[in-house]
Amino acid sequence: MLFMVMVFLGVSKNADAKDKYVTERGVNRNTTIKGISVVAKQYEEAGSYKYKIIMKKNGVKKTIAKNTTTDFTTNGKIIYYSAVVKKISSYETKNCIYKYDIKTGKYTKIISGKSYVVSGCSGRYLYCGIDMEADGIKLYAYDLKKKRKKYMTSVVANVLVDGNHVVTSTNSGDAGNYPINFFKLNGTGKKKVCDGSLLKFENNKIYYFIVRESDWKYKVYTCKYNGKQKKAMTGWVKKIPEKYGWD
């Protein structure tokens, strides 16, 4: 059985679209947008490993927060991240999500909860939820204006936002074809688009791959966010081309 962690692999992400948020969930993977670089770095404290969010602007590095999760999202003006408040058990923590204004240096507390992490942002809506590790994320759309949350779905691996839509993939330890779902920005209107593993979502097109378990080969497809206009982009291949979002 082939084991696969359903997250995007890669060293860095770059984006310059106006006010578009870019989300990262890994350690030591830089996200650069509007000349601002943000990264979650591991450090050791009192014999245990923790994480901190570091920003680099005009060549100068600044530690935004220590004892955080590895998840953050930024548009080059704002950084949303999750800080650990206290340990609840050997695998659970109480976390608080903060907003950091890069221009003013102001911190704003957004929402807190058990094992809360940041998964994405559309501007008005922050996508966050409970990290249940192997069982994925229990995802909510948090209305930053009205300060209330809407449950979206569970067992989430990745969240991608483009235009007026949100797409989520399903978390699994094994390579396979699992539901990819579509939502409106406010977290409503859930609809299953297809089965597979999500690669990227841009210009209202979803890129994903399916697995052939007989020989563990992959085929990349694209379709509209509503599941229509499905088209194969590759044949059965052993490695997914990087241009489709898999590094």
Identify what each model region corresponds to.
Residues 17-24, 46-65, 90-112, 134-153, ...:
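Surface-exposed loop/turn elements that mediate protein-protein interactions on large endomembrane-trafficking
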Residues 23-32, 66-76, 113-123, 153-163, ...:
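Repeated scaffold domains used in trafficking and secretory/extracellular systems
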Residues 42-45, 84-92, 171-173, 211:
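Short, conserved, GDST-rich strand-edge loop motifs in beta-rich repeat architectures
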Residues 156, 169-181, 192-203, 207-218:
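Intrinsically disordered, low-complexity segments enriched in Gly and acidic/Ser/Thr residues
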Residues 1-3:
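Sec-dependent N-terminal signal peptides
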Residues 39-41, 80-83, 126-129, 166-170, ...:
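Residue position within the beta-strands of beta-propeller blades
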Residues 6-19:
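Sec-dependent signal peptide cleavage junction
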